[in-house]
Design a protein with these regions (language model features):
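Short, structured coil segments at secondary-structure junctions
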Residues: 56, 61, 69, 172-174, ...
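Mg2+-dependent phosphoryl-transfer enzymes with acidic/Ser/Thr/Gly-rich catalytic loops
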Residues: 1-3, 20, 187-268
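Hydrophobic packing residues within well-ordered alpha-helices of enzyme cores
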Residues: 23, 49-53, 164, 168, ...
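Short active-site oxyanion
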Residues: 35-39, 63, 151, 211-213, ...
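Conserved acidic, metal-coordinating active-site core of Asp-based
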Residues: 98, 102-216, 237
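Active-site phosphate-binding/coordination module
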Residues: 21-123
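Short, well-ordered alpha-helical microsegments
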Residues: 46-50, 161, 222
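Asp-based phosphoryl-transfer active-site loop
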Residues: 2-17
Length: 268
């Protein structure tokens, strides 16, 4: 059995958020003919993985969902929760105020909505397009986010997120992990949560080793899983420093890079 961890945005789908037939066919072939189990490893919330999981028939082949950058791990078929790591509730006001001080916006999630104080934020609208989940405006983010959360998301222009990331690490770095998943998204998660550490836990549950794993990604929140995997693959559209740390660089997501990687690494 082979395990294949796939980032979604910038990797599995195009910038138009399309799963091409070439990539879909290659992944169905990998599962059907090469005993491969797919793990969708994304910063997206759980509901935003469903349509892709269904299109790829992941549940039928015993695959897994890893939303929130690995903050949760679920069996795709049964939805049984294998692991969950959550931000402590006392961190939410601190994160909120840091984000506000740096002129960015903060979001989080329910099962049905993206919570925000600002409905007119173009960066929040990008998350709506990516996840397919509607925004729900709340008068007070802090009062609305009263439960432990897998993550918050700071959104805004890169020039605001870079100093915000540094401030989070300086002031809350013993409890919060902060890393960019795009030029306008800063992920705020429990310390130690990343796709690599989550995959290491899943490998342990399954009795597998990193050499059984291929991981494909395009951004900084994919780096730990690319480095963990026996074969770490960077997309052709990934930043150069991500590509340098991968074992293999495939074509871009506009050129069916996932399918090309499988042709070179699995279908041989």
């Amino acid at each position: 059995m082979k395990l294949l961890a796939l980032d979604i945005d910038g990797t599995l789908i195009t910038k138009e958020h399309v799963l091409t037939e070439g990539v879909r066919s290659a992944l169905l072939r990998a599962q059907r003919d090469y005993d491969t189990r797919i793990i969708l490893a994304s910063g997206r919330p759980t509901p935003a993985l469903g349509a892709l999981a269904e299109a790829l028939q992941i549940a039928d082949y015993g695959g897994y969902l890893m939303p929130f950058n690995g903050g949760k791990i679920l069996e795709a078929g049964s939805k049984r929760l294998l692991s969950a790591q959550l931000l402590d509730t006392d961190l939410i006001p601190q994160l909120y105020h840091l984000v506000q001080e740096h002129g960015a916006n903060i979001l989080t999630y329910t099962e049905e909505h993206i919570l925000t104080e600002r409905e007119d934020d173009p960066y929040a609208e990008k998350e709506v397009i990516i996840t397919g989940m509607p925004l729900k405006r709340v008068p007070s983010f802090v009062k609305a986010a009263t439960e432990s959360l897998p993550k918050c998301l700071a959104v805004g222009p890169l020039e605001k997120l870079i100093p915000l990331e540094a401030a989070v690490k300086e002031q809350l770095g013993t409890r919060v992990g902060a890393f960019r998943s795009s030029d306008y998204f800063l992920e705020l998660v429990p310390l130690g949560v990343n796709k690599g550490s989550a995959l290491a836990r899943l490998l342990d549950v399954l009795g597998r080793i990193p050499q059984d794993l291929i991981a494909i990604g395009d951004n900084y929140n994919d780096l730990e899983m690319i480095e963990l995997a026996g074969t770490g693959v960077a997309m052709g559209n990934a930043p150069e420093d991500i590509q340098r740390r991968a074992d293999f660089v495939t074509r871009s997501n506009a050129e069916d890079g996932v399918a090309y990687a499988l042709e070179q690494l699995l279908f041989v």
